[in-house]
């Protein structure tokens, strides 16, 4: 990479929350950010509100709930002629109040379609672009969550149920109506979200296992802390949106601001101390600025290699890669 050429990072869901503040933090580090979002007007307004220079970011449309939209994004990105030096899979939908599943254009339950299938396809398609990066340290980073890791307290909470892919029978059967859960069981909206994030963490680990040694690309997940006032919770009950941030700030002490979470994400993307691949970074779910990062142990639901391999194969089939 030429000395005067900025490295380029694609961030999904960069119009608000952690993705937006990660974009800001990476721009400060000298990166050019491709803000991959559904609402480009919203993304542009948000970037300007944080003082990001118009030449420091590029807006590109993507709807991760549509596999066709993901493919169109990849085509548009390649036509732009930009290098790809890092990919941050941040966007997510969380719809805990649904009684019946919403469906993607392909007929898949929407939270799994958006959070897992969309990012799974994006990662696989852009892997070739990352391989050709001239940056000395290309990385692919996926946002994880405490609720998908049963090694942590947040991952044990049975509301509505802990993350668990079961025997993957829902994927095995094609994951279309009436099926709406990866394990093939009755629909539970909150669990569908947790399962999708568990898939994200498995995907990152599989990417590392399959491609790190041959490409040098760093594949990691992170949990930047409990961002209790993130727009992710916009589809929750209004009382939850008011009480949850207060509870995390005043009772658990686990609250982390959107800005600090974005800064932590940028660290994992760009800073040299995060070059280790195949791990899950955490800060112990605390706001404290000086808190040290550490590699968080993951549960057997993530580290089961046989199930991970099968989940990968089924996901390839369902997104049209196999």
From Swiss-Prot:
Gene3D superfamilies: NAD(P)-binding Rossmann-like Domain (3.40.50.720). Belongs to the short-chain dehydrogenases/reductases (SDR) family. POR subfamily. It comes from the Bacteria. The keyword Protein biosynthesis does not apply. This is Light-dependent protochlorophyllide reductase. SUPFAM superfamilies: NAD(P)-binding Rossmann-fold domains. It is an enzyme of class 1 (oxidoreductase). Transmembrane segments: none annotated. It catalyses: chlorophyllide a + NADP(+) = protochlorophyllide a + NADPH + H(+). Phototransformation of protochlorophyllide (Pchlide) to chlorophyllide (Chlide). Pfam families: adh_short. The gene is por. InterPro entries: NAD(P)-bd_dom_sf (IPR036291), Prochl_reduct (IPR005979), SDR_fam (IPR002347). GO terms for molecular function: protochlorophyllide reductase activity. Keywords: Chlorophyll biosynthesis, NADP, Oxidoreductase, Photosynthesis. Pathway: Porphyrin-containing compound metabolism; chlorophyll biosynthesis. NCBIfam families: LPOR. GO terms for biological process: chlorophyll biosynthetic process; photosynthesis. The keyword Transcription does not apply. Its EC number is 1.3.1.33.
């Amino acid at each position: 990479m030429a000395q005067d050429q900025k490295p380029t990072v694609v961030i999904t869901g960069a119009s608000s929350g952690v993705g937006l503040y990660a974009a800001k933090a990476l721009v400060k580090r000298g990166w050019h950010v491709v803000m991959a979002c559904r609402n480009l007007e919203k993304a542009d307004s948000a970037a300007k509100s944080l003082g990001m220079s118009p030449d420091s970011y590029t807006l590109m449309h993507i709807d991760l709930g549509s596999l066709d939209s993901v493919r169109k994004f990849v085509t548009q990105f390649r036509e732009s002629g930009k290098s790809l030096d890092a990919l941050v899979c941040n966007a997510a939908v969380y719809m805990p109040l649904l009684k019946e599943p919403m469906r993607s254009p392909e007929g898949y339950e929407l939270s799994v379609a958006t959070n897992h299938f969309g990012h799974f396809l994006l990662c696989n398609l852009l892997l070739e672009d990352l391989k050709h990066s001239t940056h000395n340290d290309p990385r692919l980073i996926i946002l994880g969550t405490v609720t998908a890791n049963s090694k942590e307290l947040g991952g044990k909470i049975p509301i509505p149920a802990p993350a668990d892919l079961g025997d993957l029978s829902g994927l095995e059967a094609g994951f279309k109506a009436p099926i709406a859960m990866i394990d093939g069981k009755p629909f539970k909206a909150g669990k569908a979200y947790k399962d999708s994030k568990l898939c994200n963490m498995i995907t990152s680990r599989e990417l590392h296992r399959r491609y790190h040694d041959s490409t040098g690309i760093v594949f990691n997940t992170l949990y930047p802390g409990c961002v209790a006032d993130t727009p992710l919770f916009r589809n929750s009950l209004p009382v939850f949106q008011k009480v949850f941030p207060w509870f995390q700030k005043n009772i658990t002490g686990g609250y982390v601001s959107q800005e600090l979470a974005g800064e932590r994400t940028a660290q994992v993307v760009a800073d040299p101390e995060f070059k280790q691949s195949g791990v899950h970074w955490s800060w112990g779910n605390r706001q404290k600025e000086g808190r040290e990062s550490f590699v968080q142990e993951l549960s057997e639901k993530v580290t089961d290699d046989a199930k991970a391999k099968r989940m990968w194969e089924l996901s390839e089939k369902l997104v049209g890669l196999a």
